[in-house]
Amino acid sequence: MPVLDIAEFAAAIPDYLPIVGLDPGEKTIGVAVSDVTLTVASPLALIKKTKFSEDAATLFQLMGSRKAAGIVIGLPMNMDGTEGVRCQSNRALGRNLLRLQPHIPITFWDERLSTAAVTRVLIEEHDVNRKRRAEVVDKMAAAWILQGALERMRGIAEAAGKGF
């Protein structure tokens, strides 16, 4: 299965199965999971990057334990809408995951400012110190990314006259 656009991705997800969202960084991959109604995203885990095969095995294990049916990968677009090096890296992650599990639907979601927004919330609303922020910001950013994709999927379903 190729990487899908968000509408194709939404159509490919079976009813009542969650999906995961990823916020890949240089040292970690934040992981979030949706509920089975694809309404709410929640932080799930933080994968400390080692070798790709080990990281992928950890991700697929998390997905299996939650019966997750698809993956949304954050795409850190530049503010002018262009793609930089990190976008290329995240797209490569998606392609590599598909090589290991070609049946899993994968899509990308524009994650501009997701980490900055989560960091701001943690500081301003929750007064979280720097050490604790470092522990949670990536998985919370993954939830932010996944929530955005879920809301777009809901909008697509509503526009098509389908319940979601």
UniProtKB/Swiss-Prot annotation:
Q: State where the protein is found.
A: Cytoplasm
Which terms does the record give in the GO molecular function aspect? nuclease activity
Mainly resides where?
cytoplasm
Q: Name one GO biological process term.
A: rRNA 5'-end processing
SMART domains for this protein:
YqgFc
Q: Which InterPro entries does this entry report, sorted A to Z? A: RNaseH-like_sf, YqgF, YqgF/RNaseH-like_dom, YqgF/RNaseH-like_dom_sf
State the protein's purpose: Could be a nuclease involved in processing of the 5'-end of pre-16S rRNA.
Q: What is the protein's name according to its record?
A: Putative pre-16S rRNA nuclease
Which source organism does the UniProt entry give?
Answer: Caulobacter sp. (strain K31)
Lineage here is: Bacteria, Pseudomonadati, Pseudomonadota, Alphaproteobacteria, Caulobacterales
